């Protein structure tokens, strides 16, 4: 059966290759702003991922396995998505430096033939080292932080500033492979 990744993320595409060597990419038009945070971060990221997957399900005519994900960073119950601009990235990193935060990914797998929807989420704790303003500005000049939740990429230059990680590394990159593997086995 055809496998579809509902994501424009290059990182998610590179990670999915480890589980599935043949898949199509269809980018969702789902408006993440439609999802309202109520009281559970796990439910919130799962619902965003579900919205993306359902958007693709409505667009395709054939049976397929659809995979979607959403990743956010939280600090002191504050959600940090992708920065709006360099100043926003600076402020996010300034908040994270020298502290522990959590990265949540919601993952959804839909088997359209079975009309089966599997939702899950994974949380990983990350400890950032202390950074001075010059280090933060230098990192932002690389442009790496500008398209990532929490304004850093653990798999890139941002990994230099990670002191410790508790949980799934791939979750922080954007696709928790171990959890996704289990979900795909259940879906097929």
Curated annotation (Swiss-Prot):
The cofactors it requires, by name, are: a divalent metal cation
Descriptive protein name? dTTP/UTP pyrophosphatase
Q: Which superkingdom heads the taxonomic lineage of this protein's source?
A: Bacteria
* Marked site: Important for substrate specificity: 11, 71, 155
Which biological processes are named by the entry's GO terms?
nucleotide metabolic process
InterPro entries per UniProt:
ITPase-like_fam, Maf-like
Keyword set, alphabetical order? Cytoplasm, Hydrolase, Nucleotide metabolism
* Cross-referenced Pfam families: Maf (PF02545)
Protein's UniProt keywords contain Cytoplasm? yes
Q: So where's the catalytic machinery, residue-wise?
A: 70
GO terms for cellular component: cytoplasm
């Amino acid at each position: 059966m055809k496998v579809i990744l509902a994501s424009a993320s290059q990182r998610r595409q590179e990670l999915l290759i480890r589980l599935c060597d043949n898949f199509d990419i269809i980018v969702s038009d789902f408006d993440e702003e439609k999802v309202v945070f109520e009281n559970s971060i796990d439910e919130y990221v799962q619902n965003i991922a579900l919205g993306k997957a359902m958007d693709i399900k409505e667009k395709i005519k054939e049976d397929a396995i659809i995979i979607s994900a959403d990743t956010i960073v939280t600090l002191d119950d504050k959600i940090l998505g992708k920065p709006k601009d360099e100043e926003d990235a600076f402020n996010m990193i300034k908040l994270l430096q020298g502290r522990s935060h959590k990265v949540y990914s919601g993952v959804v797998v839909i088997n359209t033939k079975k009309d089966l929807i599997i939702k899950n989420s994974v949380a990983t704790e990350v400890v950032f080292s202390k950074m001075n303003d010059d280090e933060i500005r230098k990192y932002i000049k690389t442009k790496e932080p500008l398209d990532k939740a929490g304004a850093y990429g653990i798999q890139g230059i941002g990994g230099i500033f990670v002191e410790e990680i508790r949980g799934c590394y791939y979750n922080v990159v954007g696709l928790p492979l171990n959890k996704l593997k289990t979900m795909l086995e259940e879906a097929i």
